[in-house]
């Protein structure tokens, strides 16, 4: 049997980690459409918005889906659709706030890793603003979030400029007495 080195620190046995994976994608509207392009809660000028019933923020939608994979509560396609039908709410910030509220009192967001693929808009200049906005909505430190962006070298519809897709991995810490 292999011995565990004394320098190896085991995690506190009262904390367990849950990992959620989220994805979303939307096609761009025609260039002349006035709907704004919103990603990570930030408006991108000179880029059309997305075909969606909501504001189409694929970053916030992917994060919502990651929360759903941890909490088992349908935010998109469930609660978001209900908010749209009954109150006309299309703001993905509200959907993400509901996702955060779906956590148990014993759960906390530990880390969020985001990857965005698309030919447009140019994301790099806005990544700090996006991280800040996401941190505000999730109530977590800025250094708990990272965003990478890729064009995908034009190999997918997203990389060819037809839309944007986002993947994310959400790590939740849960206090659990055994």
From Swiss-Prot:
GO terms for molecular function: 2-C-methyl-D-erythritol 2,4-cyclodiphosphate synthase activity; metal ion binding. Its EC number is 4.6.1.12. Keywords: Isoprene biosynthesis, Lyase, Metal-binding. It comes from the Bacteria. Pathway: Isoprenoid biosynthesis; isopentenyl diphosphate biosynthesis via DXP pathway; isopentenyl diphosphate from 1-deoxy-D-xylulose 5-phosphate: step 4/6. 4-CDP-2-C-methyl-D-erythritol 2-phosphate binds at residues 24-26, 150-153. The record marks 53, 151 as: Transition state stabilizer. One of its GO terms (biological process) is terpenoid biosynthetic process. PROSITE patterns: ISPF (PS01350). It catalyses: 4-CDP-2-C-methyl-D-erythritol 2-phosphate = 2-C-methyl-D-erythritol 2,4-cyclic diphosphate + CMP. It holds the Pfam family YgbB. A divalent metal cation binds at residues 24, 26, 61. Its cofactor is a divalent metal cation. Gene3D superfamilies: 2-C-methyl-D-erythritol 2,4-cyclodiphosphate synthase. Binds 1 divalent metal cation per subunit. CDD domains: MECDP_synthase. It is an enzyme of class 4 (lyase). Signal peptide: none annotated. Belongs to the IspF family. Involved in the biosynthesis of isopentenyl diphosphate (IPP) and dimethylallyl diphosphate (DMAPP), two major building blocks of isoprenoid compounds. Catalyzes the conversion of 4-diphosphocytidyl-2-C-methyl-D-erythritol 2-phosphate (CDP-ME2P) to 2-C-methyl-D-erythritol 2,4-cyclodiphosphate (ME-CPP) with a corresponding release of cytidine 5-monophosphate (CMP). NCBIfam families: ispF. PANTHER family: 2-C-METHYL-D-ERYTHRITOL 2,4-CYCLODIPHOSPHATE SYNTHASE, CHLOROPLASTIC. Homotrimer. This is 2-C-methyl-D-erythritol 2,4-cyclodiphosphate synthase. It comes from Chlamydia trachomatis serovar D (strain ATCC VR-885 / DSM 19411 / UW-3/Cx). The gene is ispF.
């Amino acid at each position: 049997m292999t011995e565990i080195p004394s320098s190896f620190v085991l995690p506190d046995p009262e904390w367990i980690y849950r990992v959620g994976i989220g994805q979303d994608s939307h096609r761009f509207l025609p260039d002349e459409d006035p709907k704004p392009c919103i990603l990570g809660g930030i408006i991108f000028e000179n880029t059309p918005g997305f075909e969606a019933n909501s504001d189409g923020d694929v970053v916030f939608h992917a994060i919502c889906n990651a929360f759903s994979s941890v909490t088992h509560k349908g935010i998109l396609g469930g609660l978001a659709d209900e908010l749209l039908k009954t109150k006309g709410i299309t703001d993905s910030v509200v959907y993400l706030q509901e996702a955060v509220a779906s956590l148990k009192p014993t759960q906390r967001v530990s880390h969020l890793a985001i990857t965005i693929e698309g030919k447009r808009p140019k994301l790099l200049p806005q990544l700090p603003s996006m991280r800040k906005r996401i941190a505000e909505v999730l109530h977590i430190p800025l250094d708990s979030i990272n965003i990478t962006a890729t064009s995908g070298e034009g190999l997918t519809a997203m990389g060819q400029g037809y839309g944007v897709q986002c993947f994310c991995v959400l790590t939740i810490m849960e206090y659990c007495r055994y």
